[in-house]
């Protein structure tokens, strides 16, 4: 929110300096972002007098001028159409920096004629957007004096407004705060109601549905006839230019001025462009189209409030007017709108349309509910004074919403919540200075009625904040944080397990990724999700509209982005939630991993190979083992979800519980994400892992080593082709759990030397005695039990 010091002093009687005003604003919570002093950039400029202006000998559009700078007569080549003899101008001498461009002015030749200076336009001085001609100063302006002494430029203060302080989005609201803070007094408002000269030929109405919802609760209108919509006076243009608002025409500038002066947005229609005799605030109908004042066309729907005439929507309530009924230089009859729109509805409509405007910025924060009539009367006075014409009687629909409220303020609570002791009398004085009505009958609590413009004050704690704010945040004593000894941080078993899994995957060369918990619904459907319960009602982006049923698509997309930037060989993992329902608790914590490209960089000692099924299986088994699950009891089956390759994937179970799925990502799943493969991945359900029994201990169990030599024996079994290798391993391991410490498959054969539909699995079994060296008889006995177990449980036979 920007304002000039002169503008502020229209509302605040004070002799305070700019520095004092800025300091007080920050102390009151209206933080000053910047103080702009336009005089600093204009210091080198002086008032010049055009003694003679004649044609340039070599250019029809240029003029050759002799200009008195007060100390010298300069020859200046100028292209401005209004350059003429006798004109007083803003003169830049060589060495001056032009504010609009930052260029240093130098003497130079223009079409063969030396130019020794520059006569400047408003835009070149950074004072506005007008560049059709050079600045024309009053004829009695002294020659050679500094330009800043003539222009009487005001410093501009820019403050940051918190969302609750809608009242400070107008200069008068800022003046009220400064006065309440002890920096001067608010100048009384002398505005009086202006009687209408004739009945308004245009009426106003609020649709019952719109009125009932509160989307528009109060609409005040007024008709003006015989107005002149010309250029605004200099004082009005200067104020708007100073705060960054481009002057357009008298009528538009007046509505903009009231918006920033009183935080009261207004709108004016060209009455001759309206159809019918009634303007209605109603819900927008689906498919209606309006071309707004920003030159863009918008398709309307709820929750937009359409300001409509007999032909359809002519404005977007609380946001922006329509181009078709906008005023222009030919306008002679206008209709003024001063209405009240609901903050939440205006915010929703603005987001739906994608429009940011000064009106929306104020309405969605809350405009003074009593300001419709005030805004209409203030605009009426300015229109009649500056544009002439006659005003009709007011036409009104609806009424201000009920805003009066009485809040009990217990002075004792101020010290408790605010952290500072404030005398009761000071509280009363501060709140009354703020515009509140305060009743103090000596009871425990004060009875406080906030003013209409402070829509943010609704409870006792709001009043306490105001008391402390006006008393001074800097007077709140600093209290050191307590230094009581705190217990050491305690992690739950689940948290410890999550950290352990992360570290394990990181040590295996994977990089941790953190991705969104949502993804496109079409992608979610390809990974078992996309149900209505998992679709977001208000997504942060249209392509992130569903909660993720799996982390894998996010990792696949991340790997694809890395590959597009030249990093195709990588491993990623993420630990986070996946969602299988829309209710609380319908989510699980999972660890997901993905490998793409080569498993290791190229090296002369070994050929490079792509990451495969067995690499990712080793990753997930390492994570399961690190989490403390009984790996010896795991079973592997080939029934992974559909987004895995059916012949190169599997699931890991503990009993009937599915712990993880792993394998090569299905080409269709990669195509859904527009990513090239192959890629392998896994997803481990951490919530499904059994928690460790007993209390955790920081001490490791003793390392038990056998002093006796281990014994390895190899076996080759012929089994049906459909028998899983894991089944053979488990059968062999179960033959003697005390002696057998490891079983691995080191060879698989299917070929002509075996019957069709059968395969050979070669196993290496390690026996580790603990109390004596095994004899040949003991080894043969264990071997026989191994053969018997595999034959019984898998139907296989020892290969001869």
Curated annotation (Swiss-Prot):
Residues that coordinate or bind Mg(2+): 456, 462, 465-466
GO cellular component: phenylalanine-tRNA ligase complex
PROSITE patterns named in the record: B5, FDX_ACB, TRBD
Entry keywords, A to Z: Aminoacyl-tRNA synthetase, ATP-binding, Cytoplasm, Ligase, Magnesium, Metal-binding, Nucleotide-binding, Protein biosynthesis, RNA-binding, tRNA-binding
InterPro entries according to UniProt: aa-tRNA-synth_II/BPL/LPL, B3/B4_tRNA-bd, DNA-bd_dom_put_sf, Fdx_antiC-bd, Fdx_antiC-bd_sf, NA-bd_OB-fold, Phe-tRNA-ligase_IIc_bsu, Phe-tRNA-ligase_IIc_bsu_bact
MF terms (GO), sorted A to Z: ATP binding; magnesium ion binding; phenylalanine-tRNA ligase activity; tRNA binding
Reported cofactor(s): Mg(2+)
Any GO BP annotation: phenylalanyl-tRNA aminoacylation
Start and end residues of each tRNA-binding domain: 39-148
UniProt subcellular location: Cytoplasm
Co-factor binding details: Binds 2 magnesium ions per tetramer.
UniProt KW tRNA-binding keyword: yes
Catalytic reactions on record: tRNA(Phe) + L-phenylalanine + ATP = L-phenylalanyl-tRNA(Phe) + AMP + diphosphate + H(+)
Entry-linked CDD domains: PheRS_beta_core, tRNA_bind_bactPheRS
Annotated B5 domain residues: 402-478
Domain FDX-ACB: 706-799
One family name in Pfam for this protein: B3_4
Listed EC numbers: 6.1.1.20
SUPFAM superfamilies, per database record: Anticodon-binding domain of PheRS, Class II aaRS and biotin synthetases, Nucleic acid-binding proteins, PheT/TilS domain, Putative DNA-binding domain
Family listed: Belongs to the phenylalanyl-tRNA synthetase beta subunit family. Type 1 subfamily.
Subunit structure: Tetramer of two alpha and two beta subunits.
Entry protein name: Phenylalanine--tRNA ligase beta subunit
Lineage: Bacteria, Pseudomonadati, Pseudomonadota, Alphaproteobacteria, Rhodospirillales
